[in-house]
């Protein structure tokens, strides 16, 4: 039997690194600063996340008594989850950030009207990390402009490819 080359191992490790993405956040908000936060999880939640049963699309983060919590994110428990713990799918989960980061985020949220939106859930070595972004909501005309720009970029690439192929 032959061993897999090192490239394949590295490629597969990065492919399984991302657990869940919030693509809707890019559509609904102008994302500005991004932060990496740890999550305070229970054992059954980590097992469920390993099985790919996490959803952060409906989630958001808010500041309560100087700490940041993730609200509305769903981690569906496994059937064979621990019997001595009653799993709650949408409980508030504490985000672990440095005090300076919390203070910076707190001032931007309170004074400038930003929202904290989860954008990605991923593994960093053996720990689950959440990427949160400071965001401002888009108006409907902003969404239309973004769609037009995206379509224009796609058409431009198509024309350039066709031109380069014919040349």
UniProtKB/Swiss-Prot annotation:
Localization (cell)? Cytoplasm
GO cellular component terms, alphabetically, are: cytosol
The gene name on file is smpB
- Protein name as annotated: SsrA-binding protein
Q: Which GO terms describe its molecular function?
A: RNA binding
Membrane spanning stretches: none
Question: Mind telling me which NCBIfam families this protein's record contains?
Answer: PRK05422.1, smpB
Query: Which Pfam families does the protein's record reference?
Result: SmpB
Which PANTHER family does the UniProt entry name for this protein? SSRA-BINDING PROTEIN, TMRNA-BINDING COMPONENT OF TRANS-TRANSLATION TAGGING COMPLEX
The record's family statement is: Belongs to the SmpB family.
The record's region (Disordered) falls at 137-167
- Read off the InterPro entries from this record: SmpB (IPR023620), SsrA-bd_prot (IPR000037), SsrA-bd_prot_CS (IPR020081)
Biological process GO terms, please?
trans-translation
Q: Domain of life, per the record?
A: Bacteria
Species for this entry: Xanthomonas campestris pv. campestris (strain ATCC 33913 / DSM 3586 / NCPPB 528 / LMG 568 / P 25)
